[in-house]
A protein has these predicted regions:
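Short, flexible, solvent-exposed loop/turn segments with mixed acidic/basic and small polar residues
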Residues: 5-10, 140-142, 193
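Catalytic core of non-heme Fe(II) oxygenases with the double-stranded beta-helix
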Residues: 104-181
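Catalytic core of Fe(II)/2-oxoglutarate
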Residues: 158-237
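Generic structural motif
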Residues: 23-27, 123-126, 157-159, 207-211
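Short glycine-rich, low-complexity/disordered patches
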Residues: 41-53, 111-121, 229-237
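Structured loops at beta-to-helix junctions and adjacent beta-edge loops in soluble globular domains
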Residues: 55-63, 72-75, 123, 157, ...
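Non-heme Fe(II)/2-oxoglutarate
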Residues: 1-110
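Intrinsic-disorder/low-complexity, polar/charged segments enriched in Ser/Thr/Lys/Arg/Asp/Glu/Gln
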Residues: 15-19, 149-151, 201
Length: 237
């Protein structure tokens, strides 16, 4: 069974999140706070939210530049006026502030040298993210608007009175501290932090490999039962 088969099954059955069967160390909470205290967070996607900020522990710089300085590149290269062919990827200086988070990311199943943006995401008290989805023209054109494997969203610290939910059904993603999900960002979704604390999440892009595919199958069976694996194996691709 491939991750494409799992993605197709989730799309067909309107499954928009899959909890990752893996432990996230609590030290990531303290390191997210340290990144905040050091002043690394920058405003993210003007117009899509209020109090929504980001800082990259792994990102890109213009080719030939020092990758450690790419922490403020929180969008794709074209969002910063660069092309894919004109950038180098690597760990940023935030890795020195969050060494255990970096260590965990290095141990997380991934293809060597294929990570893209790895970002701390902050939603400040009273902050909100407006109704949107993260698909693009290519995904839409290829019928892949819905894509459970498109991104991984980790909740390092999830205050009470704080949600990320589908816009249509108002169903909330069941975040708790130190939990992670494959999240279908092609679904229209919105977020609100009604608490008086910072919400610290982390979004991962890139690195899919066979070991992560195995983790995806394992997580799917834990959430929906082993019978679903047989169902997916028997479906037409």
């Amino acid at each position: 069974m491939t991750h494409k088969q799992i993605t197709n099954w989730c799309r067909k059955n309107d499954i928009w999140y899959l909890k990752i069967d893996i432990e996230i160390p609590e030290v990531c909470i303290q390191e997210a706070q340290a990144v905040y205290d050091e002043g690394f967070f920058v405003d993210h996607r003007y117009g899509d939210g209020l109090g929504w900020r980001s800082a990259s522990i792994h990102s890109f710089v213009e080719k030939g530049s020092d990758p450690s300085m790419g922490w403020y590149h929180t969008k794709n290269p074209d969002g910063h006026g660069l092309s894919e062919n004109d950038v180098d990827w690597g760990w940023t200086e935030i890795a020195e502030v969050a060494p255990e988070t970096k260590r965990w990311l290095e141990d997380f199943p991934h293809k060597e040298n294929s990570y893209r943006r790895l970002r701390f995401m902050l939603l400040e008290p009273g902050g909100a993210i407006v109704d949107h989805n993260d698909s693009n023209e290519k995904r839409d054109r290829e019928g892949r608007t819905r894509n459970i494997a498109g991104a991984i969203n980790l909740a390092f610290y999830q205050p009470e009175n704080c949600y990320l939910r589908r816009t249509d059904t108002k169903e909330e993603l069941p975040f708790e501290n130190c939990t992670g999900f494959w999240f279908d960002n092609g679904v229209d979704h919105e977020a609100l932090n009604s608490s008086n604390e910072n919400r610290y999440h982390f979004i991962m892009h890139g690195g899919f490999n066979k070991e992560r595919e195995k983790l995806m199958r394992q997580s799917l069976a834990k959430q929906f039962g082993k019978d679903v694996l047989r169902e997916i194996d028997n479906q037409k691709t």
